[in-house]
């Protein structure tokens, strides 16, 4: 039974997660080094439980720099499938993170597709999403 809610929570309880083990291998560090860095808040391992195909990465002190790609649906490009092709191209070329900057239309289906099909870290910019949900006057 899982007794933690976040990677930091686990690390502070002395628990090594499968995500920490993966990050340790990728970063050529011991699992205990990674656990300690996460516990101290020097490393983050984004690992949302809804991101079912995630291949975890660590971000922070003493780790490799990661490649991030910005994309998303917009007024000019509304086709989710085209954006997903861009996502997979970016991943195949070595991107380790995708920042979803979607700014037009119903963006939730695109984000759900990302979390089910994209194996790298995913981030969003809440301010970009906020203007889509505010009532118009």
Locate each region found by the language model:
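An N-cap/entry alpha-helix motif that binds or orients negatively charged groups
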Residues: 7-57
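Short glycine-enriched loops at secondary-structure junctions
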Residues: 50-51, 73, 120, 126-128
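Alpha-helix-loop-beta-strand connector modules within alpha/beta enzyme cores
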Residues: 61-67, 108-127
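Catalytic domains of carbohydrate-active enzymes, especially glycoside hydrolases
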Residues: 85-98
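Conserved small/polar residues in nucleotide/adenosyl-binding loops
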Residues: 130-136
